[in-house]
Amino acid sequence: MSLLNNIIIKTIPLLPKNMVKIIADQYVAGNTIKDATYKTKQLNLKKYKVTIDLLGEHIKELEQTTDITNIYIELLNQIYSQSLDSNISVKPTHIGLDIGIDVFKTKALKLVEKAK
């Protein structure tokens, strides 16, 4: 990691939250699927391809991994139904890897099947 990246990483916690929000807003589409698809549409009109990511990882509760998997499935439904030039980025620990490999495989296979 470059020296500049290290400085930025160490400085961010010291910044006022409203300043961090101004910087983050360039990269965070919003809090809902509707927000994400709206922003994706805007970027697609400018000829950008988009990767959508749900923030979070290291989930330890099975029910949460199911909820997160279902959100990704709905996100894929919206990407397809709106013909968005987009994909999703999934962190293995967000869909159960920390709980166990079988939980992760089950959730990952659901997403792969939906994405076909």
What residue ranges belong to the model's regions?
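Alpha/beta catalytic barrel-like cores
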Residues: M1-K116
